[in-house]
Structure formats: structure tokens, C-alpha cells
Amino acid sequence: MSKKVTIAYGGSNGNKFDDGVYEGTYDGVRKLIVGEDFHGIVYLKIQYVKNGDVVVKEHGRARGTHITETEFEVKCPDEYITSIWGTCRNDHHRYKSTGGRTFEQLTAADKYDINLAAKMGTPMYWNTVSELQFKTSHGRTSEQFRMPGTGGSNGVSWDDGAYDRLSKLCVGEDAHCVSSVEFHYVKGNDRITHCHGKDSKEHDKDGFISSLTFKTSMNRSSEKFGKPVGTKFQLEAKGFDKIVGFRGRSSVNRINALGANFAVVVVPPVKKLNAKGGVLGNEWDDGIHDDARMITFKLYFNKEYITSVEGHYGKRLAAPNASASAMSSFFTGYMTMLKFNTNRTTYQVLSHSPEYTYEGTSFKLEEKDHKIVGFYGKTEVSLNQIGVYVKPIANA
């Protein structure tokens, strides 16, 4: 039984995608590969497991040296993703003036003084300028001179030439870099405008996913992918435990929106633990049952079940001033101690005598929050090896 979370967070642009559901006992999300740049999440690659086969789905096609790719692997089927935290934001120009004001255009009242500090980065088309500054003073004239350009070497060169004065300028700030500059010049009675960089009209003013964090059933969280800027959101379905598929919208260079399909977790399959003891003897295997009720003792309570088996495999050495026992000299190894622990008590089948010393290996067969539902092992003249089947305890 699966359920779609009705809200997909982010914008409405991009191509719609829905990976469907992978909710079988052994199915689920195996690996997430997230591509990010200085804006946020640019693509999402998901590896699902369905009936033992790996199914790969990709959303967003942007690739390049400016993109960082990171993997988050889930230990499917024992581990699964339970929720997603993230942020979504709008991508548009912001114009700043001295004094901290932010608006679309600057006028002469702002003294043409712009100081946009941005971290060094590598946009898709050219190197970013770490600091762009324009300063003028009213009523001051000076000789014209040409200063060398500062910044990166990529991109298309431009030179507006010389004019009488600068009447207005606009600076576009996109995420952590200056993305465009627009100059309004005056020469005589003419007014000339030059714009360089990415025009604000080219920007996607719709929302997009800027960061993602995944949490699993083992209380493990992925690193934070992208830049946590914008409105926070969380994808989680009450009454449903496991994310079994993703859906949303994607464009060429970003994930615009993200939603998820959830399902109720199916009880994990029975797990076979490795047998402990010796290698001699004929193998036996009782198979799988709902519960183990009798070995050499009986579980008297309906709600009693075996939780672990403890034992010792090796030899009992002769007591001081005594001859070696026939069993000790004949066998290379055997079970010298065995006890069964239940949720109520402990049943000791074979114990160590304080009169003897023992050599060999002690062991304990146990899986947290599981009960023993079957046995297997090896026997010859004696019990040489014992192993168990376990399954999760209901309401553990």
C-alpha cells in the first residue's frame, strides 16, 4: 500500500516526472546521486531496486566542472529513507546600494556607489567577480582614463567607450555572484544604455530546490546537498514509513520541484545467522517456523520466545591429578556449554563444571529486537554446530 504526498515543494516550471513506486519486500531506494552548483540542486539521479534489478532514473541534465556530484547510499532493504528536509527559493536579480537597501534599480540619489561582496565561484558562462564597485561624486570632473579589467578571463569582452557621465546603473546579483550590469550613460543630449551579462528576463522567476537532506530508518542523515537558502520544507507522510519513489519537476539545469511516494514498511524477511561451532558432522536444517517452542525444554507461556543462544565449543580438559576423559581425548571439539535465553528466563542445557578447565570459543547467537524461530547446524556423535533463524519481534 503506497501513498503520494500531495504537495511537491518548489516551482511549477520544468518537466513533470514520477518514478512510480518500489514497495516490494526487497525493493526500495538504493542510492541517491545529487548534482549541485552554487545555486542549489541541478540534477538528481536515483538508483532503485525492483525484484533484484537496479533501475536508474535521472532528472535534470546539467553537467560540467562547476557541478559537484555527491552520493548517498542506503543499505537496502534493511535501511530505507523516511523523510526529506530541504529548501526552495526563487531565482531573480537583486540590486543593492550602500546603506543596505535592496531594490530593482539605482538612481543618482544613491551616489552610484555599489559594493557587492560575493564569494568566489565559477558560474556556467564566466568567472564571477568577487567585488564590483562603482563610485562617483556629484559636481566633480576629471580626465578620462582606462583602468585594466579585474576578474576572470572567461566570457565575451565588452567596452562601452567614454561618455560625459553615468546617470544610472543597475547591478544584478544572482545567488553568490554578480550576474549582470546595466549602465545608463549621457553624452550631450543623448542617453545610451548598455547591458552586459545575464538579463533578469532570462532568469527563472519560478521556484527551484536549493538544498536537500535525507533521513533514513537507521536514524542516519545524509550531508546537506546544495545551499540552504529560501523556504524550508519537509517531505514526510504520517502513518507511512518508507519513501518508495520520487516525483516532481525538472528542467535542463535544475530540479524545480520535488515530491515523494510513501508506503507502509513490509515486515523484513527472516534472517539466517551464521552457525557457530565445529565443521565436522552432517548438516541439518529445521527450516523456518513461526516460533521455536521446544528443544530440550518447553516454553510454557504463550508470549515467551527465545531471544538468544549462548554456548561454548571446544574441549573439557582433565582435572588436576586425573586422567583425561574418553570424550576429551577422542573428540577434537564439541559443545561444552549451551543455554537458551528467552524474554522471561534462561534455560541451561549444559553447563561448565568448576572442577574442570575448558579451552575453545564462547559464542552468543542474538539479533537485537528479534526472536529465534528456527535452528540448523551440524551433528555427528554429538552436536558440533548450531545456528538459528531470527525474525523481528512485533512491537519491539
UniProtKB/Swiss-Prot annotation:
Keywords: Lectin, Repeat
Record family assignment: Belongs to the jacalin lectin family.
Species, as recorded: Arabidopsis thaliana
UniProt KW Metal-binding keyword: no
Pfam family, one: Jacalin
Lineage: Eukaryota, Viridiplantae, Streptophyta, Embryophyta, Tracheophyta
Matching InterPro entries: Jacalin-like_lectin_dom, Jacalin-like_lectin_dom_sf
MF terms in GO: carbohydrate binding
Residue span, Jacalin-type lectin domain: 3-138, 144-264, 270-392
Coiled-coil features, chain-numbered ranges: none
Keyword Repeat: yes
Protein name: Jacalin-related lectin 45
